[in-house]
Amino acid sequence: MQTQEILRILRLPELSDLGQFFRSLSATTLVSMGALAAILAYWLTHRPKALQPPCNLLMQSEEVEDSGGARRSVIGDCTQLLTHYYDDARTMYQVFRRGLSISGNGPCLGFRKPEQPYQWLSYQEVAKRAEFLGSGLLQHDCKVGTEQFIGVFAQNRPEWIIAELACYTYSMVVVPLYDTLGPGSIRYIINTADICTVIVDKPHKAILLLEHVERKETPGLKLVILMEPFDDALRERGKKCGVDIKSMQAIEDSGQENHRVPVPPRPDDLSIVCFTSGTTGNPKGAMLTHGNVVADFSGFLKVTESQWAPTCADVHFSYLPLAHMFERMVQSVVYCHGGRVGFFQGDIRLLSDDMKALRPTIFPVVPRLLNRMYDKIFHQADTSLKRWLLEFAAKRKQAEVRSGIIRNNSIWDELFFNKIQASLGGHVRMIVTGAAPASPTVLGFLRAALGCQVYEGYGQTECTAGCTFTTPGDWTSGHVGAPLPCNHIKLVDAEELNYWTSKGEGEICVKGPNVFKGYLKDEDRTKEALDSDGWLHTGDIGKWLPEGTLKIIDRKKHIFKLAQGEYVAPEKIENIYIRSEPVAQIYVHGDSLKAFLVGIVVPDPEVMPCWAQKKGIEGNYQELCKSKELKKAILDDMVMLGKESGLHSFEQVKAIYIHCDMFSVQNGLLTPTLKAKRPELREYFKKQIEELYSISM
């Protein structure tokens, strides 16, 4: 009887019982229950969902058998390295043709005038102009094939891409030139690559080229093509030294009248020769094939395919120099999927204005720009309460990010972060950073504040652009991800720095279809970079983390020995000191005849006055830069950061000089990718460095 009673109590109610129950409720109660049910249903269908990573985040790479410790990506087919993502896109020419096809002749290249909306060239317009320009080049004594090198000396703009595609359409090779190479390097490149034709944007660059010819330094240069208008005086000056000066439109018109059938390249054909800057001696010309470039961006696509699929609706903002492969690689992804590329006006100060007008979805950045964004955001939080609220909101968003949730519609976005997102156009869904190490603090904050996927990569021109990339779903910082599916990575002992592979540390080496073919006409330096087994020795020091990701811990290339015999890697030290709140830029200098380091510090003009005021030091920016009291406060803050980061005493600077003006591309102290040009910095601050050593002895 007891069992039957229990079963009777536990039985589910009949439908008639439920109906009777609801009829007994008041109308107000029923409406309230309905509203509650609707809210619950809405939350269930719209609650934020964590991104599912494409692999086990605790094992993002694996060792390759019988390879001497090399590791590979676990994403995709691990048995062979990825050479391409699409069968119909194995060269850069095919990449663009694929974009033309799938976009339905959609908008391709965008540009704008001040305070005007973007104007667009369609894919078909770009392809036609490229064919006409290429045909026109052939009419002016250029030859079809990879023996023909064409110089492009211009800032980012649609004509740059048209010129590049013109070369690819007829299997010619692009050689980018840029201002910061300096006249001597430009002369060296023109002669080394046997360049007879250079396409430039502005007349002053044409004049620079003519000056070399007039001094009989570049006898092979015969044709200079200008994108912008020029006067007859320039044309006449060219005639006098045997150089034909033509407008780009005239060459296109000539090609339209004498159209040639395209002669597309093969994957193994040379596509571009990128000459590096910022090193001692003559620049090195890294030879990259179409297959190199396609393999590299295919690796990127493979890693991100589960969470980020590029489409025709994607918009890329182009402001990083096209002369460097980081920008070229990201743009290739966009063209391959029929997306749009909008160019900045040419003034870095108007970036935010351009982004608001363009509303990009893809935004490649260098860490220095991320640092500036981070510093500016916190500088605007100018009271203790505002700063506390900002940090509180960031921590709440960062907790979501750690759980795999990436979104821009939370309550914290509405209250704090929407304005930050709007400054980038409000539609960014992917940020890619590379070219230098990024601060974990900055990356962690911006992943939360910007509400989009932020990836970090590592590589160099010699492996096309990237060789590692962070995995979707792994939003931790302090590493550069796992190997791309297009290459293997191994570490080798760096004896002079005391890094050993037995401890999971060593010089980073890369091998795969994205690795370059060597330096143009420079066998000695090619042998230094590429060993007999095809491994590229990067000169960077890395460490494998337990999850199979790579951490950059040092740099072999810029190390030097102090007088007492200790090796020092200045870039590692600079990456620590740059986190000092008032410091915008820093150059750490050492000498093998000296026993300690000194530094050149450029304070942040927006942050330093407030920071100084908190220390009880008053004055405007110029006055503060001359203040001995402030200099000591900044040095103390830097040394404290160094101690917290585990720097040895010999790695800490003992004296600093405060410099008012920023290092820049324009003053020749930064490369176009905003890396410090160490030889130039050393020479520029020679007097100040000598004084620092004399005072500190």
Curated annotation (Swiss-Prot):
Keywords: ATP-binding, Endoplasmic reticulum, Fatty acid metabolism, Ligase, Lipid metabolism, Magnesium, Membrane, Microsome, Mitochondrion, Mitochondrion outer membrane, Nucleotide-binding, Peroxisome, Signal-anchor, Transmembrane, Transmembrane helix. It is an enzyme of class 6 (ligase). It is found in: Mitochondrion outer membrane; Peroxisome membrane; Microsome membrane; Endoplasmic reticulum membrane. It holds the Pfam family AMP-binding. It is a single-pass type III membrane protein. Its cofactor is Mg(2+). GO terms for cellular component: endoplasmic reticulum; endoplasmic reticulum membrane; membrane; mitochondrial outer membrane; peroxisomal membrane. 5 rat isozymes encoded by different genes have been described. ACSL6 corresponds to isozyme 2 (ACS2). Catalyzes the conversion of long-chain fatty acids to their active form acyl-CoA for both synthesis of cellular lipids, and degradation via beta-oxidation. Plays an important role in fatty acid metabolism in brain and the acyl-CoAs produced may be utilized exclusively for the synthesis of the brain lipid. Belongs to the ATP-dependent AMP-binding enzyme family. This is Long-chain-fatty-acid--CoA ligase 6. It comes from Rattus norvegicus (Rat).
